[in-house]
Amino acid sequence: MPFSSSTNFDCLQIDLTGPIVKVFLTLKVMSCSDGHPVASSSIGISHNFSTPLCQVENAPTASEASRVLLAFTPTEFQHLSIVKATRAEGKRKKKAFVPLSVQASELATTAPDAPRLYSVLLSTPLKPGDATTLEVLYMLTHSLEPFPAEISQSESQLVYYRDSAVLLSPYHVLEQVTYIKMPSNRIESFTRVDPTTRAGSEVKYGTYSNQMPNSYLPVLVHYENNRPFAVVEELVRKVEISHWGNIQITEQYKLKHGGARHKGVFSRLEYQSRPSISGASSFKNLLARLPPRVHSVYYRDEIGNISSSHLRTDSHKSDLEIEPRYPLFGGWHCTFTIGYGLPLQDFVFESVDGRRYINLTFGCPLLDTVVDDLTVKVVLPEGSKNPEHVVPFVTEKHLETSYSYLDVVGRTTVVLKKKNVVGEHNVPFQVYYEFNPIFMLAEPLMLISAVLLFFVAFIAYLHMDLSIRKSS
């Protein structure tokens, strides 16, 4: 059951420095003897905060609690990319955080303007009088609105951020403070909800006391944010497995700058002579974090190969720095393809039940990007059957058949799709399949048979008499 109890201390910390809003939530929740929720809270909105904690207590008179509810506005729910939670176990130096399951709550209402609820499922229910510590992280994409919507090459980018001075919570909040920290001191304006104070790049709301459940005090902050808003509108990753020793990966990108649209003409001379001022919010390169031991790396677009790329490798990773043919300003698009090979023995293994499985990283290799629509296609060797995927979050899945050179029946392809993907989705996933090694001989035998057939036909041709007149 959820807490029919109270939230005692909340801390919300939000990173506003890029296109992705990162929210670190700190709570202290406890049950009252009468069963009504009460809480105290502190909220910090920042680009770089220490690890947040959430203290949860259960009063001796309450029943066991198995979950904690998180509330989101309908707008936040639309832009919600990922929600993660951990639970602290142990004390002081021996303290460790155990991951918890987070899922949409069945208590969520269908009313269009009602809060959407998520449940953090506790690994072990809280007995009356017990307490625990939680850490919650969630991310919002496309939540920063450029204003003005169009800027020239020499102007800085300003954005709106909308939120609440108090945490939206299904619990009674006894006390709460909100801190909003911007990436720079240039804050054009911010909503005042007394008591409100500002110190440099930080705005403090509160302390607020005795907030009822689902309280909401809207605030609007207008500030400078010149971080490039790199948005991958569509990414298709194709992973082809060959049991002859290689994995070939092809990634097709449709990239755009999602910030304030560029107006006027573009001057390359001004862009190169005044790099710190001209095009401050544009970007001319991206960094792709690839697996170690990559080989045969290429980077090209619809025109051809692009030579402006740099690959740095070590035993743990490979960094590919790529530069489009032109710098990207707000509203500009580009398409390109990245391809590379991987050694089979590093990523394909055999399980204890005899099945093969590939272990790769899900998500987008490009750092600091948002992917609106991601498709991962895992092309299994011909003859594979009974594929099964293991992904630590919800994805759309279907099977299709792909054909390559010398294929007869085609290759089973596992297609995984997910929207609103961020860097935290770059976690390992597995695809299991059954494969008989005898199928590895199918294509070589076809080649050998074709060559033999050609020679037999050629020899037969040499022994045939095709002349019209018989020799005497």
Each language-model region and where it sits:
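Lumenal/extracellular ectodomains and adaptor appendage modules
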Residues: 1-472
